């Protein structure tokens, strides 16, 4: 179809921003914009038809919104209106000069009636989008596991680089976000971990009391685990002495009294040490301790009181010894009501149940 119709190239010199060609071919509707070449000039090639050899092809240019005729073409004035025109001879002259090559865009647009020629440029501009690369630094709290964005940096990529290729290079982000992500640990959690570790190595017993719960005595102070170790060792000594006495079959009164004093001294030393651990700044009077022993409902304490009374009725001389023994037994704190069973449970035990020192005392009284 294009080869059968004669073609003509319309031109306009550089200078304007936009030019539209209109004429009898589109009923003067201004539907054919001209193409701007690299030099800045405008041109367009389209097929033209003539009804007869003497007929004319009328056209006009719309330059930046103004309807203007061109001085390079013939001008026809009709009722004061100037229009350009060409004849069949002009088409033949241009063909002989070899300048009647058809621009594909213009031919297509002439057939489609008002298809904009600037559409390819608009698509080209739309493809040239700016690309950015986001670098994030994620801070992780070791205690709670919470992750937060510590810093974020946005870098514009050149046109040659592709954002998807950059993401593939860095691999999958740990936070599931696009861009490059760096994860750092929370320094606060690390410092706390380093501070706790040497404390646990130097104080293993404090760790044991923490896990099982704190033990409070009647005075409201926390008992340490060392006091329990001392008292358990005293009970073991009493059991060993009891076994030795049973092997001997009951010795003289002087030997039993000496054993009683020895066991009493052995019990005094750990109890005094345990008292230092419990409340070293306070010294409890003996009178208050004896009254506390009488008021408690623990059976071993009541037994001590009855035995000391029988001892005082039979022999009046050793009253001081009875008070001393009663004070020693009363220093052991009774188990307060409502407290849970704790690692220092052995503190509440009384060796009188096993028949230790007080069994020997009963033999002396007989």
From Swiss-Prot:
The modification Phosphoserine is found at residues 160, 288. One of its GO terms (biological process) is signal transduction. It comes from the Eukaryota. GO terms for molecular function: protein kinase binding. It is a peripheral membrane protein. There is a cross-link at residue 314 (Glycyl lysine isopeptide (Lys-Gly) (interchain with G-Cter in ubiquitin)). It is found in: Cell membrane. One of its GO terms (cellular component) is nucleus. Involved in G-protein mediated signal transduction and in the regulation of polarized cell growth in pheromone-induced cells. Belongs to the CRP1/MDG1 family. This is Signal transduction protein MDG1. The lineage of its organism: Eukaryota, Fungi, Dikarya, Ascomycota, Saccharomycotina.
């Amino acid at each position: 179809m294009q080869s059968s119709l004669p073609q003509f190239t319309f031109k306009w010199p550089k200078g304007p921003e936009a030019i539209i060609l209109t004429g009898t071919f589109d009923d003067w509707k201004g539907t054919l914009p001209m193409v701007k070449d690299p030099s800045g000039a405008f041109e367009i090639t389209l097929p033209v038809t003539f009804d007869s050899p003497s007929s004319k092809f009328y056209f006009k240019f719309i330059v930046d919104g103004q309807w203007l005729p061109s001085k390079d073409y013939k001008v026809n004035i009709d009722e004061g209106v100037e229009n350009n025109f060409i004849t069949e001879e002009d088409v033949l002259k241009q063909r002989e000069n070899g300048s009647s090559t058809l621009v594909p865009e213009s031919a297509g647009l002439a057939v489609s009636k008002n298809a904009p020629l600037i559409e390819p440029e608009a698509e080209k501009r739309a493809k040239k989008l700016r690309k950015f690369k986001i670098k994030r630094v994620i801070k992780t709290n070791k205690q709670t596991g919470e992750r937060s964005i510590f810093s974020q940096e946005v870098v514009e990529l050149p046109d040659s680089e592709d954002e998807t290729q950059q993401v593939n290079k860095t691999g999958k982000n740990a936070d599931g976000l696009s861009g490059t992500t760096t994860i750092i640990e929370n320094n606060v959690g690390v410092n706390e971990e380093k501070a706790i570790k040497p404390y646990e190595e130097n104080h293993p017993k404090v760790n044991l009391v923490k896990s099982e719960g704190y033990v409070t005595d009647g005075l409201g102070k926390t008992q340490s685990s060392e006091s329990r170790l001392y008292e358990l060792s005293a009970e073991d000594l009493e059991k060993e002495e009891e076994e030795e006495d049973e092997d001997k079959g009951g010795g003289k009164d002087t030997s039993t009294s000496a054993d009683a004093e020895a066991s009493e001294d052995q019990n005094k030393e750990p109890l005094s040490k345990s008292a230092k651990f419990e409340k070293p700044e306070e010294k409890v009077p003996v009178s208050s301790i004896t009254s506390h022993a009488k008021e408690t409902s623990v059976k071993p304490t009541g037994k001590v009181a009855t035995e000391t009374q029988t001892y005082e009725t039979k022999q009046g001389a050793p009253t001081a010894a009875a008070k001393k023994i009663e004070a020693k037994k009363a220093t052991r704190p009774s188990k307060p009501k409502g407290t849970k069973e704790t690692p220092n449970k052995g503190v509440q035990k009384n060796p009188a149940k096993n028949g230790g020192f007080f069994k020997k005392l009963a033999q002396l009284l007989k």
